[in-house]
């Protein structure tokens, strides 16, 4: 009775996120508005928003398989240890199963959503390496057609932003909380006239954000050959 309260020291560490400032500005002359059938302002604003989205994608992809910084001062570098060597093949079902197994062996909670970022070529590879008689064929075909976006427990995200080293494309399989995006300043948009530019309309977007890999056990690099 009345024993001491047990003290449990849960191991933890901090990760450093270096914020990067992004700006986008473009001018639309009044003459352009006259020459075009529609007001181009909304198209320019949409292009700026897409540019900011691509910048966020690049930060996340770079952080996923790059060097993470941890420790009290954020100066200790940590490399990603989970890497599936590509051999001489593109993306195969065997590689997807290995990525899933890697996360499972690392005791990643299966209730946490899992994603995999691949390129268009990897979807084609999956379809080409799956036999028509295989039970996986119809699922992969539906994936290639965009009818579904999930296979083997992964939500598929198709991107052209993945790095290519020679003929090797680095795809990324990860649990959702394995990568964090830090936003210092959310996306701000302004559309104003510039008196100093002949009263041209300026579309301006800015933001400040960065990303880091939170846990190595929750991120797997899947290397795929592209010929």
Q: For the regions a protein language model found, what residue spans apply to each?
A:
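Long, contiguous amphipathic alpha-helices that act as assembly "spine/axial" helices in icosahedral shell
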Residues: 11-72, 104-120, 156, 189-213
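Sequence/fold signature of self-assembling virion shell proteins
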Residues: 3-6, 10-18, 35, 84-91, ...
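Extended, solvent-exposed, turn-rich assembly/linker loops in the middle of proteins
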Residues: 70-142
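Generic signal for short, ordered secondary-structure residues
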Residues: 26-27, 78, 182
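Generic structural signal of hydrophobic/aromatic residues within well-ordered alpha-helices
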Residues: 60-64, 99, 123-126, 222
């Amino acid at each position: 009775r009345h024993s001491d309260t047990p003290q449990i020291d849960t191991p933890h560490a901090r990760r450093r996120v270096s914020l990067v400032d992004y700006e986008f500005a473009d001018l639309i002359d009044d003459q352009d508005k006259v020459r075009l059938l529609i007001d181009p302002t909304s198209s320019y604003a949409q292009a700026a928003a897409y540019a900011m989205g691509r910048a966020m994608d690049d930060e996340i992809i770079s952080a996923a398989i790059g060097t993470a910084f941890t420790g009290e001062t954020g100066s200790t570098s940590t490399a990603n240890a989970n890497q599936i060597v590509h051999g001489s093949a593109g993306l195969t079902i065997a590689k997807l199963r290995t990525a899933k197994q890697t996360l499972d062996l690392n005791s990643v909670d299966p209730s946490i959503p899992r994603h995999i970022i691949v390129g268009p070529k990897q979807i084609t590879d999956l379809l080409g390496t799956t036999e028509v008689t295989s039970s996986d064929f119809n699922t992969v075909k539906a994936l290639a057609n965009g009818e579904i976006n999930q296979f083997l427990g992964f939500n598929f995200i198709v991107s052209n932003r993945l790095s290519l080293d020679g003929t090797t494309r680095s795809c990324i399989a990860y649990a959702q909380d394995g990568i964090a995006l830090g936003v210092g300043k959310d996306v701000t948009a302004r559309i104003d006239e510039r008196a100093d530019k002949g009263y041209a309309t300026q579309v301006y977007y800015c933001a400040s954000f960065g990303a880091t890999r939170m846990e190595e056990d929750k991120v797997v690099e899947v290397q795929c050959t592209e010929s």
